[in-house]
Amino acid sequence: MYILPEELRAELKRPLGELHRSFSDVDVGNSFLITVGDVTTRNALEHGLKPDVSIIDNRIQRRDSDHEFRDTATILRSRNPPGTVTESLWKSIEEAIEGATERGERFMIVVDGEEDLAVLPSILLAPPDTVILYGQPDEGVVLVRASETSSKAEELMKKFEEA
């Protein structure tokens, strides 16, 4: 398990990619698509996007979410306490990406705990042409290109404490 050190919290509150104020401004083209977060995943689906992998925790800004996802993606379940990246989450992301790239299946990972930090392993495990979308609370949606951000994600993960 990787534990987020206190000194990284402020850095991770800044967007890792392009911040878009409106979801309508987001253009993912034909890229492999990963969405992280309930609101981001819901917005993607409402805008006609079909994420190859989506990661949710049924919570929005630390409160239980009451919306249902009407999606045909295969469901995977993972445990991941707040402020961590667990082996369970890492393996679920790996399994989902593998299934999506090799078999063309779509996956939704439902996290028991918190999915906020799933962006980092998603960047590191994703194929180079991947776009990752995640929410920036009260600001918009962040578009991250895995190929442009993988070295930054690796640098950040190296600063996590291993437990």
From Swiss-Prot:
Q: Biological process GO annotation list? A: coenzyme A biosynthetic process
Residue spans making up a coiled coil are none
* InterPro entries for the chain: GTP-dep_dephospho-CoA_kin (IPR007164)
> Under which pathway is this protein filed?
Cofactor biosynthesis; coenzyme A biosynthesis
Q: Which Pfam families match?
A: DUF359 (PF04019)
Q: What does this protein do?
A: Catalyzes the GTP-dependent phosphorylation of the 3'-hydroxyl group of dephosphocoenzyme A to form coenzyme A (CoA).
Please give the name of this protein.
Answer: GTP-dependent dephospho-CoA kinase
Q: Which organism is it from?
A: Methanothermobacter thermautotrophicus (strain ATCC 29096 / DSM 1053 / JCM 10044 / NBRC 100330 / Delta H)
What are the top taxonomic ranks of the organism?
Archaea, Methanobacteriati, Methanobacteriota, Methanomada group, Methanobacteria
